């Protein structure tokens, strides 16, 4: 099993729920931090979801008002993502919410069993 430490940036350019991180079906991930910033001058609502591939269900884990011109950590705890899972983000205010997801990817490609 190989462990890769990675960062994935995102910029919410639409009001639709957007996949900001997806895990392939041969890996799992441990999300350590979701750093977000609001580059606008007014507060913006941020909703974040985990898509559970094995249950074909989406669960909301964040509903927050990100103040104008500020930074913060959206993940208040570590998230464990299984094979095929994803993180989605949504805001009604486009082009102001940006962020970086820091995670460890545990790749099981070629693993026996």
Residue ranges and their predicted role:
Residues 1-29, 33, 91-113:
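C-terminal interaction-tip segments
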Residues 30-32, 44, 83-85:
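A generic structural signal for short beta-strands and their flanking turns/coil linkers
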Residues 36-41, 92:
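Short solvent-exposed strand-capping/beta-turn motif centered on an Asx-Ser/Thr pair
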